[in-house]
Amino acid sequence: MDSNNTEFKDNYQHIPDDIPLTNIKLPNEWVLYLYDKQLFKKMANRPNFQAKPHKALCTISTVNDLLYIMELMKVNNDPKIKSVETDGKINLDANDYIIMRKGIEPIWEDPRNSNGGTFTVKMDHSKGYDVWKIFIQYILGETLTSEISDMKSINGITVSYISDSYNFQNPASKNTLGNTLGNSLGNSLGNGLGNSFTYIKIWDGKPDRTRDQFVSMLPATIIDKIKSDSLMYSQNSKKKHFNEKNIIGKLNSGRKPSNTRGGFSSFGNKRY
């Protein structure tokens, strides 16, 4: 059993060692999407431009599926080595990805997303994969929070790699958790691999949640990982381009993107 399998089983002690991971169903099914945010911006800004910026790649329904995706997403954290060749992988250096509950469209306007918001963590890219991996284990295992009603409103997770410096537009919302708790941990932005960052966004369907309310329900393991990073919570209904006229029609037009970021053109046809 590899380290990923061991780590996962450590978090789920009730899984007998003699049961193959391929036979263990996740509590619910999820869909992995390749996301092209530049295409979305074009669609939002051009009245007659129709496209679908998110492309469904596969369904994640078993523990084995989850472990396989985590393995494919691995990145090289050595600051002297930049991963540019993906070898068919879907690692976090190459593209932006969304994992969403099956049956929910990965857009703000979906009825199960529209009244909620997104909790965003901005961190140095060198630790982005590790934090993302922990988040998806909790989310897809339905254990991010002990409250069932809160867990049911966690609809998905987006991960993005940003290679240039970018700051949240709401300074009051980007304080680190360490500062919020009165610690002297400071803000870690800019202290890592150049200006390379990982953004992780959690899709939350619950209305009127605040950043601190969301943080308070997270496991201690995650809080410890992100307490010195930049955190923000934003309501979907207040975002630019929310409920743009004909946005649903544009998304459902069936028009394919003209190009794909990264070296990931054939994975969409792969089954497992």
From Swiss-Prot:
Polar residues: bias regions: 255-272
Protein name: Eukaryotic translation initiation factor 4E homolog
Domain of life according to the entry: Viruses
Region (Disordered): 249-272
Any one GO BP annotation for this protein: regulation of translation
GO MF term list: RNA 7-methylguanosine cap binding
Presence of the UniProt keyword Kinase in the record: no
Purpose: Recognizes and binds the 7-methylguanosine-containing mRNA cap during an early step in the initiation of protein synthesis and facilitates ribosome binding by inducing the unwinding of the mRNAs secondary structures.
Record's keyword terms, sorted: Initiation factor, Protein biosynthesis, RNA-binding, Translation regulation
Family statement: Belongs to the eukaryotic initiation factor 4E family.
InterPro entries reported for this sequence: TIF_eIF4e-like (IPR023398), TIF_eIF_4E (IPR001040)
Keyword ATP-binding included in the entry's annotation: no
Gene3D superfamilies: RNA Cap, Translation Initiation Factor Eif4e
Residue stretches spanning the membrane: none
